[in-house]
A protein has these predicted regions:
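Short, Lys/Arg-enriched anionic-surface-contact patches
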Residues: 4-26, 71-75
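Long, charge-rich, low-complexity alpha-helical segments
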Residues: 27-76
Length: 76
């Protein structure tokens, strides 16, 4: 399993404390927005000068957050 803790950082001095890829100012939310828009991990990596492992770490981080937080979706 991907150890996202080695690649994702939260630092109040960088991007106002938003989660970013280590050594960059690329926010996790930007990578996820691009994935949601249909971009491939390879396209995102190239566009933002990341590695595929960085993109995979973002996905693993998001999966971990999804386990921890309940977001109400409304009733049917």
């Amino acid at each position: 399993m991907m150890n996202w803790q080695e690649r994702i950082v939260v630092d109040p001095e960088i991007c106002h404390g938003k989660a970013c890829v280590r050594g960059t100012r690329v926010m996790v939310s930007v990578v996820l927005d691009n994935l949601a828009a249909g971009e491939t991990p390879a396209e995102i990596a190239k566009a933002y000068h990341l590695t595929l492992e960085d993109v995979q770490a973002v996905i693993a981080y998001a999966a971990e957050l999804a386990k921890e937080r309940f977001v109400p979706l409304g009733s049917r």
